[in-house]
Amino acid sequence: MSPAAPVPPDSALESPFEEMALVRGGWLWRQSSILRRWKRNWFALWLDGTLGYYHDETAQDEEDRVLIHFNVRDIKIGPECHDVQPPEGRSRDGLLTVNLREGGRLHLCAETKDDALAWKTALLEANSTPAPAGATVPPRSRRVCSKVRCVTRSWSPCKVERRIWVRVYSPYQDYYEVVPPNAHEATYVRSYYGPPYAGPGVTHVIVREDPCYSAGAPLAMGMLAGAATGAALGSLMWSPCWF
């Protein structure tokens, strides 16, 4: 009797996370850093120690990705989160505040207290556990939206070359977009995993390295150049008052 032929996998069961090093995924509420509004995103914790959040569970349109590995100072949940209010209709027991070593902070909210505790455990483990060799992680992507069409640009987590990025906050989409430098827009610039820095009326351009390298020096030079430009413009605006 010949052995039975193997049954092909059902295409309906295929997942976008197949053969990818996904540690944990699920829906969480995220508070934006500028307007302090709550938005529901699909979060994916990858085995390389990064936490990405997306528009839906297909993980095709990534809004941003945060470095967790060796970058978490502490995580507070529930009543420990004193300086944040939960989304409307949600319990305070589901709150999570992730304090990063680089100065950033994530305010999240899970559906239940148990879900919040499970996320805290997974994040702390990702913070202290090195990624195994050969782990496959999807490339990082950003959506660049123009007035005519939308395209997606992707890059690998760690490459040697340096790139210049300008990140503009979109109040309509409630996240940062990577766009070419535009002198007619107020551009908000931040370090890749750090808090935003705003310079009203001045376009800031910095040299951003990949996460494997420090971006402190280019960021400092960019902020210094922006401050000097702002001071020069201010002196020109007040110069008519001297005559």
Curated annotation (Swiss-Prot):
Keywords: Cytoplasm, Developmental protein, Membrane. GO terms for biological process: phototransduction; regulation of cell differentiation. Highly expressed in retina and brain. Levels are very low or not detectable in all other tissues tested. Residues 21-128 form the PH domain. CDD domains: PH_evt. It holds the Pfam family PH. GO terms for cellular component: cytoplasm; membrane. It comes from the Eukaryota. The keyword Metal-binding does not apply. It is found in: Membrane; Cytoplasm. Homodimer. Interacts (via PH domain) with MYO1C. Interacts (via PH domain) with MYO7A. Binds transducins. This is Pleckstrin homology domain-containing family B member 1. The gene is PLEKHB1.
